[in-house]
A protein has these predicted regions:
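Coiled-coil dimerization/phosphotransfer module
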Residues: 1-114
């Protein structure tokens, strides 16, 4: 495929089943979108915990997103990703990366809110 993926992942990460599945699906959909649409040669994937949140960032060096699709999340895949994050009370952002390409950032609470 010619897509290089640079990963910065924690040595150990303990997530409940629902969050594990959500993160897997988010990364899967994001990489599928990059492969199909971005014409990218590299993706940087960072997964870390900060305070009580799981933080995921994917950045590619592709052609970028059509702003009309990101503004209102018109793409079915992007809407699905946002809904998946919203289910945990998280935050989902996607847009142009500085210097070109696309960056997606996700923050999900590590525990359910009471």
């Amino acid at each position: 495929s010619g897509l290089r993926i640079e990963r910065d992942l924690p040595d150990a990460l303990s997530l409940d089943r629902e969050r594990s599945i959500a993160v897997f699906r988010l990364v899967q959909e994001a990489l599928t979108n990059v492969q199909k649409h971005a014409r990218a040669t590299q993706v940087d994937l960072v997964l870390e915990t900060r305070d009580d949140r799981l933080c995921l960032r994917l950045r590619d060096n592709g052609i970028g997103l059509d702003p009309s699709k990101t503004r209102k999340l018109k793409s079915h895949g992007l809407r699905g990703m946002k809904h998946r994050v919203d289910a945990f009370g998280g935050r989902f952002d996607i847009g142009a990366a500085p210097g070109g390409g696309t960056v997606m950032t996700v923050e999900i609470p590590l525990t359910d809110l009471p």
